[in-house]
UniProtKB/Swiss-Prot annotation:
It comes from the Bacteria. Belongs to the UPF0178 family. PANTHER family: UPF0178 PROTEIN YAII (PTHR35146:SF1). InterPro entries: UPF0178. This is UPF0178 protein DMR_20710. It comes from Solidesulfovibrio magneticus (strain ATCC 700980 / DSM 13731 / RS-1). Transmembrane segments: none annotated.
Length: 150
């Protein structure tokens, strides 16, 4: 099992939680981004730097992810592709994307996009809070215990 992170917009506290978990549990973490990243030196952590372009990071993750892997992303279309490949997806606020909820998430994303395009200001998500960080850490820990046994 590997953990892939859509690291371009990944909040630093979430990246730090992932790095600590990978080192502590000996699980491969692959940070995929189109920019240089800072991360602790560890045999369990690698970075894949991709070229600029729309959804290039997503394409690399989808190409590499295997059933049972975990992908960390706030990108709902990417999460849908991951779930379709029988892998798992978790967003930086600790919410799991599953076969049961992904279609609803895609529909809501589409609706909000239409509202923005029509001039209705919908705003973005609020800044990552301490509660969000805690929820992410708890969900990650629960997932790793369930799927890796450690």
């Amino acid at each position: 099992m590997k953990i892939y992170a859509d690291a371009d917009a990944l909040p630093t506290p979430i990246k730090d939680i992932l790095c600590r978990a990978a080192m502590r549990r000996g699980i491969a973490l692959v940070l995929v981004a189109n920019k240089a990243l800072r991360f602790p030196e560890s045999p369990h952590i690698t970075a894949v730097r991709v070229g600029q372009g729309f959804d290039v990071v997503d394409g690399v993750i989808v190409e590499r992810v295997a059933p049972g892997d975990l992908v960390i992303t706030a990108d709902i279309p990417l999460a849908a592709q991951v779930v379709e490949k029988d892998a798992h997806a978790l967003n930086p606020r600790g919410e799991r994307y599953t076969r049961d909820n992904i279609l609803g998430k895609l529909a809501m994303r589409g609706l909000l996009s239409e509202l923005r395009d029509s001039g209705v200001v919908t705003g973005g998500p609020p800044p990552l809070s301490n509660r969000d960080r805690e929820a992410f850490a708890n969900q990650l820990d629960q997932f790793l215990r369930q799927y890796t046994g450690n």
